[in-house]
Amino acid sequence: MDDPFSTLAPRRGTQPLLSNWATIGISELHGGALGWGSWWSNLSRLGSSFGSNLKNLGLKAWNSSTGQALRQHLKDTNLQHKVVEGLSTGIHGAVDIARQEVDRQLAKRLENYEPPRVASTEETVDDVKTVALPSKEDESERVLVTKIREPPPPYDAVFGPAPSAETNKKQKFEETLQNAGLVSSPPAPIAAPAAIAVPAQTTMSHPASSRRRHHWQGTLDSIMGLGLQPIKRRRCF
């Protein structure tokens, strides 16, 4: 929105008092002579140049005679090995200190530990109570006779006497005669007369009364009304 803030300024008639700074507050304002983009580019350029200059100085110092002498002295004194040994010694020392602390805590707990008290045999014997066991009754007295199993009946009493050879021959002879038609077969049993089913008595149901059948009509008449019903009475004056 390019409407300047001068529209909010006090006016003298139609002329605003800030007419000389009418461009204040619009999109054409770029900060005057100060450009933030140039500042950022200058800072980034300065940082990159500073880093490259520092790198070049370090390489020159490392490759110089002083740097070579320093490296040779470090190699002669075996500084790298000493640093590694110092680090390993410090690590082992820290581990030893931790182990000593753990051992100290364990020893302290063992000193404060009290073993459980074991009761002596005499006390245990005194604490034991003698309990009288009930006398064992005779096992024969506890046996309850619930059922007496009788011996099975003999074969002859159930199936009858075993047929002899003569009876078998007689039965076979009678069967052959029956097959030949010489001996009449016994008459078939006469079936008993079947019971005649007597029909049940049916009762005639009378139709419902017209009043009950037309119950809704009676309800309608009571709602609508039938007028006054005349009543004839004889009176003597």
UniProtKB/Swiss-Prot annotation:
Region entry Binds to importin alpha/beta, involved in hexon nuclear import, spans: 227-237
Record-annotated site: Cleavage: 32-33, 226-227
Annotated segments matching region Interaction with hexon protein: 51-77, 220-226
Post-translational modification: Ubiquitinated by Nedd4 following partial capsid disassembly; which might play a role in intracellular virus movement during entry.
Gene: L3
Protein name per the record: Pre-protein VI
Propeptide: 1-32
Gene Ontology terms: biological process: lysis of host organelle involved in viral entry into host cell; microtubule-dependent intracellular transport of viral material towards nucleus; viral release from host cell
Domain notes: N-terminal amphipathic alpha-helix domain is essential for the membrane lytic activity. Late-budding domains (L domains) are short sequence motifs essential for viral particle release. They can occur individually or in close proximity within structural proteins. They interacts with sorting cellular proteins of the multivesicular body (MVB) pathway. Most of these proteins are class E vacuolar protein sorting factors belonging to ESCRT-I, ESCRT-II or ESCRT-III complexes. Minor capsid protein 6 contains one L domain: a PPXY motif which binds to the WW domains of HECT (homologous to E6-AP C-terminus) E3 ubiquitin ligases, like NEDD4.
GO annotation, cellular component aspect: host cell; host cell cytoplasm; host cell nucleus; viral capsid; viral procapsid
Region spans: Amphipathic alpha-helix essential for membrane lytic activity: 33-57
Pfam families recorded: MCPVI (PF02993)
Species: Murine adenovirus A serotype 1
InterPro entries in UniProt: McpVI
Modified residues (Phosphothreonine): 146
